Amino acid sequence: MTLRLSAIELRHSDGTLALRGLDLSIARGERVAIIGPSGAGKTTLLNLLASALPPSAGQLQVLGTDPWQLSSKRRQRLRSRIALIHQAPPLPARQRVVTAVSAGRLGQWGLGKSLLNLLHPLDISGAREVLARLDLADKLFERCQQLSGGQLQRVGIARALYQQPELLLADEPVSAMDPRLADHTLALLGQHAIEHNVTLVASLHAVELALAHFPRIIGVRDGRIHFDLAASEVGREHLDTLYANEQLSPQPVSDAAETRWTPRC
């Protein structure tokens, strides 16, 4: 089992209870989408799974171990097996794309190799290969400040794929992309997860993309799991209650398909 949560709660430093009573298991190789209204706790949940935030209560198992029972050094080793794709990747503006991508393996390299890579990228061909999968091979030596928001998101994804993690977490990874590119990018992430038996967990606002690309859908509202269903079982009634008091708009679909709904965010 890649992930196991039992009675998890997480309270922020200001006292806000962001996650409450979460019970969840995700097996190796599963592809899971987390959906829900803004402020539901999706990003907090992903940071918890990445061992970036400790739970306030409950039991957490990530890749077979409790991250917060480990020493700092061993927890850092665990994190090298986990990639977290941020909605706005924290990439230095003047950093070149090749360096940003190869930084995905800094947690697996020693200090000397990491410093050398900052001066001269050690695996240009490897970085180019993963960028090519995202149609960014021509941006290899450009600086991050020269890229659009969608291109920066794809660089963040390339960095995560280059890391070769066992657990791939993605927080709104395609929010800055046009619909066609978002669809293509999620298909690529899903195919990578299948080919490499990687566990993929992504938060998405676009419900139709979640239903199209992920076999399992978890709806989160007010820090709680509202439903946990196969994508084929998610109906309008589930989405209506998940997004209660949110403004929803129907997406155009074929006559044979079930109407899917997407929150405006």
Curated annotation (Swiss-Prot):
Locate the residues binding ATP.
G36, P37, S38, G39, A40, G41, K42, T43
- According to its UniProt record, where is this protein located? Cell inner membrane
Specify the domain of life of the species encoding this protein.
Bacteria
- What PROSITE patterns does the database record attribute to this sequence? ABC_TRANSPORTER_1, ABC_TRANSPORTER_2, PHNC
Q: How does it sit in the membrane?
A: Peripheral membrane protein
Q: Where is it found, in Gene Ontology cellular component terms?
A: plasma membrane
| Keywords, alphabetical | ATP-binding, Cell inner membrane, Cell membrane, Membrane, Nucleotide-binding, Phosphonate transport, Translocase, Transport
The record's principal subcellular location, in a coarse class, is: membrane
**Its Enzyme Commission number?**
7.3.2.2
Identify the residues that the record assigns to the ABC transporter domain, covering every copy. Answer: 3-247
Coiled-coil portions: none
Question: Annotated Gene Ontology MF terms?
Answer: ABC-type phosphonate transporter activity; ATP binding; ATP hydrolysis activity
Instruction: Look at the named UniProt entry and state the broad enzyme category this protein falls under.
Output: translocase
Pfam families per the UniProt record, alphabetical? ABC_tran
Annotated catalysed reactions:
phosphonate(out) + ATP + H2O = phosphonate(in) + ADP + phosphate + H(+)
* Classification via InterPro entries: AAA+_ATPase (IPR003593), ABC_transporter-like_ATP-bd (IPR003439), ABC_transporter-like_CS (IPR017871), MetN_ABC_transporter-like (IPR050086), P-loop_NTPase (IPR027417)
Quaternary state and partners of this protein?
A: The complex is composed of two ATP-binding proteins (PhnC), two transmembrane proteins (PhnE) and a solute-binding protein (PhnD).
Which family, according to UniProt?
A: Belongs to the ABC transporter superfamily. Phosphonates importer (TC 3.A.1.9.1) family.
Q: What does this protein do?
A: Part of the ABC transporter complex PhnCDE involved in phosphonates import. Responsible for energy coupling to the transport system.
Q: What's this protein's name?
A: Phosphonates import ATP-binding protein PhnC 1
Upper taxonomic classification of the species? Bacteria, Pseudomonadati, Pseudomonadota, Gammaproteobacteria, Pseudomonadales
